[in-house]
């Protein structure tokens, strides 16, 4: 059965950049590259906001990627640790670790689903990604559209409900949220 995923919102553009071509995009705006049987024209990017992961962990040419991250006017990074992308950022927004927030984890191809209870208060001014993006959305007058009027626990409950419904349709019986969360 399919586990819940956060809504990605409506794409206002019909183009995308393969993550493996981020350096090309930043270093060669306007260039055309082949991708998946199509030609993709790389846009000019003035701002990069990187949250969730570290591109330096999986890029083929770290020196080239490092040079690429120096090109945009502004680089913002949300992260729990001061990793290489943070060193190249103009703004680093400290994000909570999995120990400092409530969450739940599920294996993509197996049956494992586990609650992840917050074990410690966030260090210094760290905030979870949801709160960081909700604060930014608020500055643009879009908080309600972004949060759908849910906080961290509201989203956890909502995502559990979707997953539980999907499981039921697949012939599996998952417990009510209260039982799962305890």
Annotated model-derived regions:
Residues 40, 111-112, 137, 141:
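Glycine-centered secondary-structure boundary/capping sites
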Residues 90:
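Catalytic, metal-anchored helix/loop core of enzyme active sites in primary metabolism
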Residues 1-87, 97-104, 170-182:
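Extended redox/cofactor-interaction regions of prokaryotic respiratory oxidoreductases
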Residues 96, 111-122:
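Short beta-alpha connecting loops at secondary-structure transitions
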